């Protein structure tokens, strides 16, 4: 709950912004505690911003820890590197396919992502 409160107090979203994104990874808690705490955060953020948050996680983490159907309605940003296509068969919106990409004008390596949809679908995901 404190993390959700901190997020709400720190992040002001404007028209055209993507919904809040939560990077969820394994921590010391057991899977049931993790899922419970995650759902509390998601519900609080969704009530405040009136939009479903995006879950950013790895393909393996999603299949191991977020396999409960209560998480199926959330848009996913799946990190799955060094493969030709994302293996996750569920409803994913973004795929981060590398963390060592290159782009003109940027000296350091960068993350590269693909949106699973059209430009119009991407616009529909944004804050209105």
Over which residues does each language-model region extend?
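Extracytoplasmic/secreted cell-surface and envelope-processing proteins
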Residues: 1, 28-34, 62-67, 86-88, ...
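A short linear-motif detector with a strong N-terminal bias
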Residues: 1-2, 34, 55-58, 72-74
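Substrate-binding cleft of extracellular glycoside hydrolase catalytic domains
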Residues: 1-51
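Structural recognition of the beta-strand scaffold that forms the well-ordered cores
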Residues: 18-24, 52-56, 75-78, 93-96
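Aromatic-lined carbohydrate-recognition surfaces of secreted/lumenal glycan-active proteins
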Residues: 49-63
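Functionally critical loop-and-helix segments that line ligand-binding/catalytic clefts
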Residues: 67, 71-128
